[in-house]
Curated annotation (Swiss-Prot):
Originating gene: pyrF
Pfam family, one: OMPdecase
InterPro entries for the chain: Aldolase_TIM, OMPdecase_type-2, OMPdeCOase_dom, RibuloseP-bd_barrel
Pathway linked to the protein: Pyrimidine metabolism; UMP biosynthesis via de novo pathway; UMP from orotate: step 2/2
Family under the similarity heading: Belongs to the OMP decarboxylase family. Type 2 subfamily.
Protein name: Orotidine 5'-phosphate decarboxylase
One term of GO molecular function: orotidine-5'-phosphate decarboxylase activity
Reactions performed catalytically: orotidine 5'-phosphate + H(+) = UMP + CO2
EC number: 4.1.1.23
Amino acid sequence: MIIDRLYENVEKKGCVCVGLDTDISYLPKGFLNKFTNIEDAIFAFNQRIVDSTFDVSACYKVQIAYYEAMGIKGMILYNKTLEYIRKKGGIVIADIKRGDISATAKMYAKAHFEGDFESDFITLNPYMGMDTLEPYKDYFKNKEKGVFLLLRTSNEGSKDIQYLDLKDNKKVYNKVGEKIENIGKEFLGNCGYSSIGAVVGCTAEENNIRKELKHTFFLIPGYGAQGGKAEVAKSYLSEGNGGIINSSRGILLAYKKYDEEGKNFEECARNEVINMKKTLQII
């Protein structure tokens, strides 16, 4: 199961997930000016971020929207970034947040678990219902793939639906979590966690989610730039594992803390990952 690989990476390298939500504005001007086109510049930037953080981070999350917005050339860049990480032996999460009926979901599964856009994990939105997961299950069982389902997200608007009260004094996200936990038991790895994980933002208190979802591995966004605190992020883990804590802008733009020109941006990114790990261990 792919979840066993991710669990082992967390054990060996720590729980940090590096987000490659790479916007052109994030590139140091001196670095950008070395290239004749934006796509080559961003790919080179991504390469150097990956190379500098590879031995100190568990995995990488690539937000597809940043690449889709650049059109066909952006999707070629997306493909090259995914391939670069996977050929190095890294684990990549494609942050695509798809969610649709089974016929369409089958095509999404094929698109993102095979071919040009193949990744190890993808993010999905389960709020159309759990039947939308059916086309992905063969990939979990037989092709070393996994998903993270949106459960309780880090944005302020998550309260509009996810936090609604139900008759049994639970909230919508609690019920969705129960379904994720139950479905996930069919795809448990040797590590005790399922290849069906959940997205839980650390901009809100943990509130027993970790205890209730014992077999669900967490993708934890919201740390740093979105306001999530280290002590809250760490509370979603179990003995330092059971989840990955994502940081994107905090790592990609770490150079701005020390060197506005960004001559050593990859070294700054590496140091940010290391400091993040130290902070999480201390608390």
